[in-house]
Amino acid sequence: MKHEEETCLSIFVSLSFLLGACSDQPTETTAPKEEKANDAKETTGTKENEAKEVGTHTAQWSYDEHTGPEHWGELDPANSACVNGSEQSPINIEFSQVKTDKKLEGIHIQYQPTTFSLVNNGHTVQVNPTTESSNIVVEGNGYKLVQFHFHTQSEHQFNSQNYDMELHLVHKDANGKLTVLGVMIQERRENEKLASVWDVLPKEETEKDISVKEPVDLQALLPQDQTSFQYNGSLTTPPCTEEVKWVIFKRPIEMSKVQIQAFQEISPDNHRPVQSLKEREMIRN
């Protein structure tokens, strides 16, 4: 009898040890999996936050009160030039302050009738060439047309007066330097050269480019009298990058009231106020 009790006790102890070992094993293997899962969640969360943060920075600025021009420099450290820059654009061009005693090389504009696509980027309507056939030469350096867009009212002023709109034709050279041609727009007759662009103006922000059905002849769009003012400035939108060469034509082009209103329905006011000229020179060609 005593031998049977000892045998049962021995079996019970052995079973207990085996059950204990089995119950401990999942605990040891599960913990690392949970830690890895938590690590993965933390990593994913960080990447999602970074993506949201970057997206917010790129879409944060506007022309409205709280994220408008007065606050651009506060929205992102990359926009510091908007408040600290020494050569900011646009400017007021006082004709009496323009230097006429300096000789500048002529601007050679070599635009070809080109097909374009356009996009409403939330800040303006931007028109992009589908070829690289249009370019300019400024002071012996070649620049290719990369896009053109519009502002209302005009960003630059002549003798403290704004025009109804302003056209910016943006060009880039082989080193990434920019030259922008600025053309004032006044309300008068319909501009047939831009009719094909105005026919497809997107009223809301677009994700994909919209094709312009007919080629646009930008050479014929420019004023015949190409007297211009030149100065060194910046982008007129964040990040307000400087070292941009500006060429502002003195003579405006025309658009009808209907055409101007069609753009203003999309962008009621997308102009940056004029900035201080400081020590810069304005030169007339």
Would you name each region that the model predicts?
Residues E4-S10, C22-N285:
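Alpha-carbonic anhydrase
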Residues L15-S16, L75:
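Residue-level signal for mature regions of secreted extracellular proteins and peptides
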